[in-house]
Structures are given as C-alpha cells and as structure tokens.
Amino acid sequence: MSERDTICALASGQPPAAICIIRLSGDRIWKLAGALLDCGLPEPRHATLTKFRDEDGNLIDEGLVVFMPGPHSYTGEDTLELYLHGGPAVITHAISTLTSESGVRLAEPGEFTRRAFEAGKIDLTEAEGVADIIEAETNAQKAQALRQLTGGLTEQYDQWRADLTGILALIEVVVDFPDEEDAPEETTAPVIRKLTRLIHEVEEALGDRGVGEKIRDGFRIAIIGAPNAGKSTLLNRLAGRDAAIVTSTPGTTRDVIEVRRVMGGQIVWLSDTAGLRETQDEIEAEGVRRAERVAAEADLRLFMVDGGAPELGVLNSLFRQTTDIVVVNKADTELAAGLPEYDYKISAKDGDGVPELEAALADFISNKAASVEAPVITRARHRARLVDGLACLFAARDALELGTGPELAAEDVRLAIRHLGAIVGSVGVEDVLGAVFSQFCIGK
C-alpha cells in the first residue's frame, strides 16, 4: 500500500439520507479539485458552494466543499470533504468518479485515523478512543471514550514513562560512575522509593476489577440454577422478547443464550444457561460445563430456585459469593417448605416481582461501574502491557535491593518504558495496528 495514494470514502451514514459526506485525503486532491469541481481548489477551511462533475463533464450534484491543507488536518495530509445530497445514485456516481482517477482508491477501515496516527496527530489510545466514541451506546461509554480521545489515558501513561525515564537516568549514574564512592548509596535508596511508588500506582490501576473494559464491552449477569427453575422464562421477561425456548421438559436449554441490553446506564449481557445437574447426556453435560464457566466469569450471578420444588444441591455445589442474588421463582404457586434464604420472590411467567429484581440488577451494575473513577485501562491490550511492565518494575527493584547489579535494573526499567510506550503506540506496535484500525468504519 503506497502512502502516496489518495484515499476516499463515505464518512456519513448509509444512504438514503438528506446529506452525505465524502472524505478524501492525499496529495492528489489539488488535481481532483481542478478537474472535477467548478470552483477549483476552494479557499482553505471555508465552505464553498460548487458543482461537482465527472470526468466527462456530466453534473453529479451541487453541494458544499471544504478543503483542509496538510499538515493542519485530521490526517496531516491535504484533505477534502464533499457535502452532497445523500441519495444512493449520487454517492455511487461520486465515489466511482473519484476512484477512477489514477492514484485514488477507496479507503480501508480506519485508514484515515491510521494516517493521523502515523502523522503523529494522535497516539494509539486516542485512536482507540475514536473507534469507541463511534460505537458508544451509553453515556458512560461516551464519557470514557471522550476521555480517551482527548488524551486522558495518554496523560497518565506519559507521566509514568517520564518518571521511569528519570529513574533510568539515576540508575545509569551508578552504571557509568561505579568508582564514585558515594554514588551507589546516595542514588539507590531514592530510586527504590520511586520504583515502589510507581509499583503501587500501577497495581492500583490494575486493581480496577476491569471496570474500564466492562464499561466498553458490557457487564455480565449469569442466570443459573437447576433445570426447570424458570431461567429461560426470566431471560425472556428481562429481554422483552422470546430469546430462549421455554418448555416444561428439563434440560431444554443446552447452550448459553445471551441477550444484550442497557441496565443502570451500562451495557449488560444477560446469560441464560443450561440447568445444573448430573447427566449422562454428552450434549447436556457440555452445556452444564459452559454454564459453570459463564457463572465463574460473571460480574453477578442470579441463582434461580423453583419455589415449588427447590433443588438446593445447586446452591451448595458452587462457591457462594457475597454479591450472588438468590431468586425464588414460581411465587404464583404454592411454595414448598425448606426454601433457602432468598433475596427476591418472583413469578417469571406472570412478571410479579420482576420489576423490583430488575431495579436491583440495574443498581448493582451502576454501582459497580462507578466503583472506579476514571479507569486507566479500557482494553485487554492495555492491561496485558501493564502487567508485563509491572513485572519489570518488580525485577528492577529486586535487582537494586539485592545488589545484583544496576545494569540489570536499568535493563528492566527500559523494558518497562517500552511496555508503556506500546500502549500509546510509540514503540513496538506494528503487530497490533492492523487489529486496532480494522475495527473502524470505512470513512474514519
């Protein structure tokens, strides 16, 4: 792929629409404007009304055009945006005309933002913030994406890198001047204190219970219990539709069924699972294993108990967590004696008690999302690099405390700096760039 290619794409929603935006970036914009726009190359950063024609002079449409010369543009290159009527025929004619010109092609997903990254206009976390704000469905997702897009995460990572650069400079004093009598003693203690402070800060960031990733990707609630306890009926009630098959036959649900919705201002994945019981059926047994895995990974577990015929062995077979919610179902029937302590009594079939349960679920998710203010980590990629960087910080501190050599400590600090640099995209990220930008829409 030549960096000299001029790229173009529809940057607005799919047609038909009142207005469409076609975006171009690259060094052939001057030639395109002269050949296809009646106004020629417009005055920079001014909306200019003009007629847009194809290579044969046929009128495509009349609309506005805005020219933003590089390097002071989103991509750092010359960019042009066409504001035309958003009908399919106009868009098809316009884009086919542009891409028929030599050196002009359709942009790949995220290519405009990738060029902005390569031009140093944004770093990798800010680029991810662009993708996240486009995909944001909730105010919480939007706020987190805006913070990332405007450099909120970068600021923290850059501060850590700056601190480590200062620490590295101090360690290298000891490496470069080993014969200075007081240098090691005067330098090592402050460096250890600085490393310890950084270790605590990174550990605190890693101890956020994944809230940043969950705000972005969704929290998970697992509905578990014995067969025929009403799990699928409750899922359908919470989903507002028939997402799961409901029958009176135990073991109907054999795989995990997930429903996505907003609760407590957050994206939530509700999982209906296979009934937990011993079974010789190979397919059902696999469903039980999947149910146990989903339960282990969930942010909240709902234990469904059949109020008429409770199977308490299910409650006893899984390690109980303080956040677990026990729900007695079939409250519209005569309840059996010996029910366990429960939090809510409902009839999933009729809906009695479900609004109160749903409100409790929303409160739990809302409180969990608010438990960490301004998370530093919003993607698994960030977390993995921080974990590796933290290991380097521990190794550097150990090398200094045990006296195994400042050279080893210096190398560990350099590695930690590289891990932090990989988060913002300043070093060693070629292997992840494709994955990051492929998640974007074409026109961004």
What are these regions (language model features)?
Residues 49-69, 251-279, 297-300:
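Switch I (G2) and immediately adjacent beta-strands of P-loop GTPase domains
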Residues 2-14, 53, 139-262, 279-281, ...:
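C-terminal-of-GTPase-core extension/linker across diverse P-loop GTPases
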Residues 284-308:
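Inter-motif core of Ras-like GTPase G domains
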Residues 120, 228, 272:
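Conserved G/P- and acidic residue-centered "switch" motifs that form tight phosphate/ATP-binding loops
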Residues 24, 84-86, 238, 273, ...:
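Glycine-rich, N-terminal phosphate-binding loop of Rossmann-like dinucleotide-binding domains
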Residues 1-143, 147, 151, 326:
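A glycine-rich (often HGG/GG-containing) alpha/beta subdomain
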Residues 270, 304, 327:
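Generic enzyme active-site microenvironment
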